[in-house]
Amino acid sequence: MLLGLAAMELKVWVDGIQRVVCGVSEQTTCQEVVIALAQAIGQTGRFVLVQRLREKERQLLPQECPVGAQATCGQFASDVQFVLRRTGPSLAGRPSSDSCPPPERCLIRASLPVKPRAALGCEPRKTLTPEPAPSLSRPGPAAPVTPTPGCCTDLRGLELRVQRNAEELGHEAFWEQELRREQAREREGQARLQALSAATAEHAARLQALDAQARALEAELQLAAEAPGPPSPMASATERLHQDLAVQERQSAEVQGSLALVSRALEAAERALQAQAQELEELNRELRQCNLQQFIQQTGAALPPPPRPDRGPPGTQGPLPPAREESLLGAPSESHAGAQPRPRGGPHDAELLEVAAAPAPEWCPLAAQPQAL
């Protein structure tokens, strides 16, 4: 069943035949559509309009609008089909349900409008004209039908009876639908409760197993701490490496300390050698001066002084001034030239000249005798 909104016509499947109900608007209810179709097929009884979308079916209430119900499907509105089903014979023997109050509406359907019942003395409503239309083209305007005077009363009674039947059927379907919904919710709740109970039991069992495992691990750790076993090869190797590193560090520290001591001792030895060299040099210088003085004294004692008429008394002769080591080791002429000048004709001029003219072989053995002294 497809709905053409532009043509304002509703397609309903009745006993496997597609029929088109013209003049349908957004305010047209399911009750009006059912009455029109029942009059068109000429059958009496209880009917219900079913909305089918793919594999799902839903019974429409008498006051629902098929156009609005189809519009709520959105993009699947073109897949919606309406089917008219006959649920049973008409309730001719039952008392009129005009005096019976309508059933209470639950909160889910409380917003649906309730249409007032038509009075018996009111004018007959405008009937809808269902016509079978296998094609999608809109039919042309139908010719007006003139009802006969004798059939008006019968038609009016039939309409009222069909209306009551549709209302009762709509209420029954509504309560059946609500019952099915509540039963489905109850089944869902029970299934969820069972699933939660099973999950709770499973988690409790897992918690107990984990608790037992944790206690076992704690006991093992306590036993391992109280009675340590043989160390693992990795731990022993690591410990040996740490010990070797500590020994090497101590050895390096000792070597560095010994190197520092050796360097300080070497510096002290160098200073001592320098001091000894200086002392030896001073001793050599003093020894040479002593040798020079001894040589001068020996040479002066061996050579008699020449007789001079102007020489003073022997007791007035002063000591011989020592000559410098460097000038004596060098040329005798330089030593004589570097000596302090004395006045010519002094008492020691002849002796100084004789010492300066002495041969060199006699000086060398004396200068080379520091150990004999």
From Swiss-Prot:
Highest taxon above the source species: Eukaryota
Record keyword Signal present: no
Localization: Cytoplasm, Cytoskeleton, Microtubule organizing center, Centrosome
Gene Ontology cellular-component annotations: centriolar satellite; cytoplasm
UniProt entry keywords in alphabetical sequence: Apoptosis, Coiled coil, Cytoplasm, Cytoskeleton, Ubl conjugation
Residues forming coiled coils: 175-227, 248-297
Ranges for region Disordered: 122-150, 300-356
SMART domains xref list: RA
Main localization category: cytoplasm
PANTHER family: RAS ASSOCIATION DOMAIN-CONTAINING PROTEIN 7 (PTHR15286:SF11), RAS-ASSOCIATING DOMAIN CONTAINING PROTEIN (PTHR15286)
Oligomer and partners: Interacts with MAP2K7 and GTP-bound NRAS.
Protein name as it appears in the record: Ras association domain-containing protein 7
Gene that this sequence comes from: RASSF7
